[in-house]
């Protein structure tokens, strides 16, 4: 999928219109619902429901399974980038350096970046202004 064709599914448009996302963004729950409109299982975890070590384990386990993916909702400012909340996939975890590789969906502006696990966790452990929940 791309940001342009994600909403081509009629079921997806019933959940949330792309115009709304362009204007105000998307919450973690909404993302889970949108992904569920495609025949996939999406599990939503908020940082307030887990802890850093559990997050490491969940992501490492998920990355070891073919056909599984991890998307993170994080506050860009907390990892030294511009703007606010953002969602991007994690491509890898390096246990030796304790860093995650984020493949930014805005690759025209942000190249892939290795982020310390603790820094990413702090960026996720911020409140989403729309949902009032942590990311």
Segment roles from a protein language model:
Residues 36-43, 64, 95, 125:
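Sec-exported extracytoplasmic/periplasmic mature domains
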Residues 95-135:
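Noncatalytic regulatory segments and standalone regulatory/sensor domains
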Residues 1-50, 132-133:
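Cysteine-nucleophile protease catalytic domains, especially the papain-like/related folds used
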Residues 43, 69-71, 135:
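Ordered hydrophobic segments in well-structured contexts
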Residues 26, 30-33, 54, 58, ...:
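Extracytoplasmic/secreted proteins, especially bacterial periplasmic and envelope-associated proteins
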Residues 19-28, 46-50, 83-84, 89-93, ...:
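Short, exposed beta-strand "edge-strand" segments with a Pro/Gly-rich flavor and a Y/T-containing core
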Residues 50-101:
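Active-site-adjacent substructure of cysteine-protease-like catalytic cores
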